Each structure stands twice: as structure tokens, then as C-alpha cells.
Amino acid sequence: MTNKNQSFGVGQDSMSSMTCLIHVLEAWFGVEHLEDYWNFANYLLWVFTPLLLLILPYFTIFLLYLTIIFLHIYKRKNVLKEAYSHNLWDGARKTVATLWDGHAAVWHGYEVHGMEKIPEEGPALIIFYHGAIPIDFYYFMAKIFIHKGRTCRVVADHFVFKIPGFSLLLDVFCAIHGPREKCVEILQSGHLLAISPGGVREALMSDETYNIVWGNRKGFAQVAIDAKVPIIPMFTQNIREGFRSLGGTRLFRWLYEKFRYPFAPMYGGFPVKLRTYLGDPIPYDPKITAEELAEKTKDAVQALIDKHQRIPGNIMSALLERFRNKQKINQKTL
């Protein structure tokens, strides 16, 4: 009985302290009924928080469409120059890269560790883990263009090419949907190429445990062997805390396997700390098989996850990392 009375007393003290604080603030600011305002603000927060969590991911899509509108304006402004210049889109790429790099810095404090592993010239195949929304790769492409002056081609899922309005964006930033022969041709021409073997399936079905969802895919490894290029593994810390997908549920798994379209809803858009880590390049080896190279690459990406990612991921911890400085050793950070 005594314990209950003590607990009740503690509750009363807490309420009295809050009431007292509100009265002090009312007297200080000369505002009446401050407690009612406070309760109303709490009610609004309770009502709108779920809505905000669902809207934030679509802000990224909004930014993509703003980029597309800018590219259309740029194209029409330079319609006469197009016939005379092979570098028509360089100015647009530079502008868009600067805008996305600014967004990365402000919203995520974005960093790239190991940029020196990207060659100044010549080909390389970049293999990366696919987040629910691969916004980290947009930021990474912007960094490469700004600091290396290079455009990184990327293999995108076929459904992306069917999104209304995206065709110009994909053309300007050199996205392709394969096939393998085209990938080999791009690399043999001396370009950078990025592939996420997990693709949309990994985006939907992986989660805060950061499990790699590649299945038996090894086509990317055969591309690297045929083109005789190194593979650079890549992983972005906290990418699953920025955006979360509900695609791992049975219904959305079935819908994806049936229609090959990502119907699963997403939530997030949280301003978590994002750090992209580039692993040591896996050099070309004429004696290795595609199966062995695929497994070796998967192990390299997994090693980056094990080293740099808290498992399971935690949104609050990822947010707090914005205010912590990690010591950077023996790696160039951008």
C-alpha cells in the first residue's frame, strides 16, 4: 500500500512540476491558457506524424521531377547548340550534381570514404547494396562528377524506364537496362559502370538487418571478366534508416513476383547520417570463374556492412550520428 501511495505521489509531483512550469511560462510571456496550446500541439503531432512519415519519401521523387523539369528547360534553351556540340549536357549535369550534392550535405551530412579508389580514368565496375530508395547512389554520382569529372553509368531496373517523364533523366545520366553485351561495351570503352545485383528485390525485401538479397545472380561477375576490369564494392551506412520499405511482407512479395513492379509502400525520409564506403578493388583475374567472383564480391560487400553498419539498424541512432564525429584514418573523405 505504501508503494502505491509513493508511486501516486511521484506522479503528482511530476504533474505539479509541469503545471508549475507552464504557469511560470505564462507569467513570463504574458500568454494565457498556455497549457491548452501545449495539449493542442501534442494532439497535432500525434495526428500528423504518421502522415509525415508517408509523405517524406515522395519528397525525393518530387526532387527527381524538379530535376527532369530543369533538364527539359535546359534542352529547349540549347536546342540550336545541340547540332554543334557533343557536350551539350555537361552544363546540366554539373548544375544537377551541385544541387544534389548540396541536398546530400544539408539533409544527410553525406560523406564518401575511399574516393581515391575510383580511378581518375579507365574502367571499373562498382557493385553496391541497394537501399529501399537508392538516394545514396544519386549522391555518389554527384560526388564523382564534381570531384572526378566523370559520369558513372548505371544499370537500372526495366520498370524505371516506364515511369512517366523519367526517360530524359535516364538518358542524360546514362542509365541503361542491359543487356550484358552492352555493359561489357561500356566498360571496354573506358567508362565507370555501377550495378546492384540485388536490384528492386533487395530494395523491397532487405530490411534493417541489411541482408544481401542477390540470389544466384552472377551476370555482373561475367561482365567484369569479359571486360577485364576490377570490381569496386560499395556500401552506404544507414541507408535503410533513411527509408524503410514494407516489401518484406507476404502480400507485397507476392505482388512483386507476380507483376515485377514494386507496389510496396515506403516511409521515412529521415535526415540520418549517410556515409558511403568504397572497399578495396577486386582486380581482374583470368583464372577465376563467374561464380567464384560473384561470391568474392558478395563477401566484400558483406565485409563493408559488418565493419560500418550497426545491426539491426536503428533510426534514432542514425539520426544522432549527425552530431558525432568519427575519426577518419587512411582514407580520403569527401
From Swiss-Prot:
Q: What is its EC number?
A: 2.3.1.-, 2.3.1.20, 2.3.1.22
Among its keywords, does the record have Membrane?
yes
Instruction: Give the bilayer topology.
Output: Multi-pass membrane protein
Q: Where in the cell is it found?
A: Endoplasmic reticulum membrane
Source species, domain of life: Eukaryota
Instruction: Tell me which parts of the chain lie in the Cytoplasmic compartment.
Output: 72-125
Residues carrying covalently attached carbohydrate according to the record: N5
Catalytic activity from the UniProt record: a 1,2-diacylglycerol + a 1,2-diacyl-sn-glycero-3-phosphocholine = a triacylglycerol + a 1-acyl-sn-glycero-3-phosphocholine; a 1-O-alkyl-2-acyl-sn-glycero-3-phosphocholine + a 1,2-diacylglycerol = a 1-O-alkyl-sn-glycero-3-phosphocholine + a triacylglycerol; a 2-acylglycerol + an acyl-CoA = a 1,2-diacylglycerol + CoA; an acyl-CoA + a 1,2-diacyl-sn-glycerol = a triacyl-sn-glycerol + CoA
Gene Ontology terms: cellular component:
endoplasmic reticulum membrane; membrane
Active-site residues (renumbered): H130
Activity modulation notes? Acyltransferase activity is specifically inhibited by TMX1 at the endoplasmic reticulum, restricting accumulation of triacylglycerol.
Query: Can the keyword Oxidoreductase be found in this entry's annotation?
Result: no
Q: Which UniProt keywords apply?
A: Acyltransferase, Endoplasmic reticulum, Glycoprotein, Lipid metabolism, Membrane, Transferase, Transmembrane, Transmembrane helix
| A Gene Ontology BP annotation from the UniProt entry | triglyceride biosynthetic process
- Write one Gene Ontology MF term: phospholipid:diacylglycerol acyltransferase activity
Residue ranges that the UniProt entry lists as topological domain Lumenal: 1-50, 147-334
**Main function:** Catalytic subunit of the alternative triglyceride biosynthesis pathway, which mediates formation of triacylglycerol from diacylglycerol and membrane phospholipids. Synthesizes triacylglycerol at the expense of membrane phospholipids, such as phosphatidylcholine (PC) and its ether-linked form (ePC), thereby altering the composition of membranes. The alternative triglyceride biosynthesis pathway is probably required to provide the energy required for rapid growth when fuel sources are limiting. It maintains mitochondrial function during periods of extracellular lipid starvation.
Which family does this protein fall into?
A: Belongs to the diacylglycerol acyltransferase family. Highly divergent.
Please identify the protein, giving its name as recorded: DGAT1/2-independent enzyme synthesizing storage lipids
Which species is this UniProt entry from? Answer: Bos taurus
Q: What is the lineage of its organism?
A: Eukaryota, Metazoa, Chordata, Craniata, Vertebrata
